[in-house]
Amino acid sequence: MKYYIQHIIFGISVLLMAFSMESCDTDHEPVKVKTPGISNQNPELYARYLSGLRTYKSGKHKIVFGWFDNSEKIPASQGQNIIAVPDSLDYLVLTLPENLNDRELSEMKEIKEKKGIHTLFEINFIRIKEDYDAEKEAFEDNSDNAGKIFNLDFRTYLVDKVQKRLKLCSTFNYDGVVMTFYAKTKLYMTEKEKTAQRTLENIFLGIAKDWKQRHPDKVLALAGKPQNVDDKSVFDLCEYIIIPCQASTSASDIVYSINKAVVEGVPNNKIIPLVSMYSKDKTDTKTGYWGKSLSVLGTAKLAAQQHTDYQIIGLAIDNANNDYYHVRFVYPTIREAISIMNPIVKI
């Protein structure tokens, strides 16, 4: 049955790829993604493909996350539509999770129901701290506040921001959240610094732990440096542990980061490295590259291999949108990465 389903997916995927080449647009008017031609010309075959796709995703395979820039609320091209992402993605992480419009909500619903793609969003500790610092600086730079003290404590601010963001799950029916916290090593900290760091850890990851316990049906992925977290029990609750490796320059860098992360208390069977897609800026030859090769493809090859001390169960891709626009067909790098990790079984 597994072989049969995979061959159905492969065969129809070839047809869909052909139709996707025809539907690549270069106009700059607001557009709506066209339903692939095969869904109209042979709806029965397309329905079999979608059924096989969902069955495939419900089984064991390498997971793929894609970070998606949804800042364009009135898309000027198909590549800015949620519904245009590769069918074989498992999780789509929206970069702007608030104020979703009807089109976005409709597309989120469609890719989940038809293709089994779940939509998440990220809560990033560093960005919350940057927002707090910006608010504090703006307050202090305002001449009307001369002689006044900025009384908003960061810990209070952190709790409020994280809790408000988590409410987006129910507001917009997200399937879960990626919570990113770069815990710092406490080896060289003073006792005062250790206490302050543990307090922030306990707030951010404590909220994550409590939220997951109250929402067992939602997905929790944790990203950062798990080896530096004191209370590692939260990693038993999450489905995935994402290791950010955007700065990597080789497969060896990925292996090094994972080896550092997989310490006692960190499950070794939930590991997913996060790397960058190449930049849309053609002069940027570093982002998303290992020398002249693409980091996404190199990491996919690494994920496809067997490892003694841990399991790489998938791949996470930052700036996934950048891979859309190509002459031959859309999202070629992501499609190739998925094929590397989940090859068609030939019989």
Specify the residue positions occupied by each region the protein language model found.
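Bacterial Sec-dependent N-terminal signal peptides
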Residues: 1-6, 13-58
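A general structural signal for short secondary-structure junctions and capping/turn motifs
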Residues: 2-3, 56-57, 111, 263-264, ...
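Residue-level marker of positions within ordered structural domains that often coincide
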Residues: 29, 97, 320
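Generic recognition of flexible, low-complexity loop/linker segments
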Residues: 52-53, 81, 302-303
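C-terminal transmembrane-bundle signature of multipass membrane proteins
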Residues: 53, 63-66, 340-347
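Chitinase-like catalytic core of GlcNAc-active glycosidases
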Residues: 61-78, 83-89, 93-261, 267-281, ...
